């Protein structure tokens, strides 16, 4: 999330928390090792952090209170209240007494995450995506190493025949090590182990790379499992409300886009509400701004992630696709294309999305066409096929399998679309 650092200048305490500084990512993907280093591409002043989410969330909450927000901790929001089709308030339980309370608001920002109070519970228009129906299993080690060419503090992403591993350096020399695969494959693997601990240990042993990286570390008991099922809502906003972050959509953990999309949608929602209150735009105009920019960010990343899951395509094709997804970037002399590596970095760092929002651009990126007859066009077809299969609810198979069937499709759309 390097793009958000300048937007959070008042959160100096983030630096004080001692999080590992993250300067990029190294992927051992297919037959290649390749790294994206923020400092080499964007300069030495751009970086991000490998945060402990519980601690990081508390930092953000504390800062919100310092800025004047009224914070009620321990409350459970039961539902959002509507007057017709307009969100007007919320109902929650009082944390000390358990009594139900209600409040009315000019605008409601649904940041309820996967609970999705408005899209999933109220409107019931959030649709799951079988293509990215993945499950993650992970644990923590004291001590360990990263691959030699890794950017400082960068995540290592290591491909496997039926999934992929992450190795993340955290503060105090702790490492998060996880494996992600499709739910079907996860359940098949689970049958062969008496416990989740045994399964994780076997997975680490199965990968020579991960095994060597963790050889000097000590496993800390406690395995976590999370369903990383992708989904998207039919609408991201409406009269009186904005659905932000995971409430509106969730992609996949492959390129670590979750925190960026949460911050980005929060930025868009805040700007939209402020512009409405100030009388700069109508509520309808603000909703169009939010819906277009947030959905385009999600769909663009969806296309890139679906393509990267085709592990044998190679970084040159990923970079070329990223260049087409970013399209034209604004410069002092007009518009110019960026090189593929920079475009890829801009996408996974979130800079492309923030640049679009700040420049007021909501034009979809230029997309390759299947009739171009080159590898980039075919890679887009593969990603587009995964999208169509997800939209249709088929197949119940890993995205890599769906991508391998890409020749069955012909696509001439100029933008990704998940609705």
Model-identified regions with their sequence ranges:
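FAD/FMN-dependent oxidoreductases across multiple families
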Residues: 17-18, 187, 191-272, 277-301, ...
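Short active-site alpha-helical segment characteristic of glycosyltransferases
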Residues: 56-59
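Mobile, glycine/GP-rich and aromatic-enriched active-site lid/loop segments adjacent to catalytic centers
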Residues: 120, 159-162, 168-233, 237-239, ...
